[in-house]
Amino acid sequence: MTEYLLLLVGTVLVNNFVLVKFLGLCPFMGVSKKLETAIGMGLATTFVLTLASVSAYLVETYILTPLGIEYLRTMSFILVIAVVVQFTEMVVHKTSPTLYRLLGIFLPLITTNCAVLGVALLNINENHNFIQSIIYGFGAAVGFSLVLILFAAMRERIAVADVPMPFKGASIAMITAGLMSLAFMGFTGLVK
């Protein structure tokens, strides 16, 4: 049980996929202008990342490895991720049309989010079992969502602040992301 808790905490805080591994930067910068959009994207990504992680594990364990076709791993995982994203898009469209409109183009772009493919591939490379795959995928998703929501809240505050002209827009966003990354470095010794 402790092993699973450490894996979860390590994935969320210590080895955050956005701030440490630099995966998922496109939605991190693109969807973080409004807090409600960031929350919606975080929830959708959490669902997709967890489900894609588990699905990739199952495809690897029960199809690719037994047939000896591990060289098709990346292509297979992209296909699995696309199916999971389409399913998520249909669910969001049915349950929350407002969120569906707010997320706009970013919902289908979860398919190309490198964090989703990165988590699936790292899961296999680190030889996680089924339970660890679920926890790793969920932890990565929670970490992504946490950082996305915190960053969106900071960007909303910065939007109304008196920022010098040369720092407005992307410049202050990158500085803020860098400071946020430094803050998360404080968790480095938490899990070994």
UniProtKB/Swiss-Prot annotation:
PANTHER family: INTEGRAL MEMBRANE PROTEIN OF SOXR-REDUCING COMPLEX, ION-TRANSLOCATING OXIDOREDUCTASE COMPLEX SUBUNIT A. It holds the Pfam family Rnf-Nqr. Part of a membrane-bound complex that couples electron transfer with translocation of ions across the membrane. It is a multi-pass membrane protein. The complex is composed of six subunits: RnfA, RnfB, RnfC, RnfD, RnfE and RnfG. Keywords: Cell inner membrane, Cell membrane, Electron transport, Membrane, Translocase, Transmembrane, Transmembrane helix, Transport. Its EC number is 7.-.-.-. It is found in: Cell inner membrane. The chain crosses the membrane at residues 5-25, 39-59, 63-83, 102-122, 134-154, 171-191. Belongs to the NqrDE/RnfAE family. The gene is rnfA. One of its GO terms (cellular component) is plasma membrane. It comes from the Bacteria. One of its GO terms (biological process) is electron transport chain. This is Ion-translocating oxidoreductase complex subunit A. InterPro entries: Ion_transpt_RnfA/RsxA, NqrDE/RnfAE, NqrDE/RnfAE_oxidrdctase. The keyword Membrane applies.
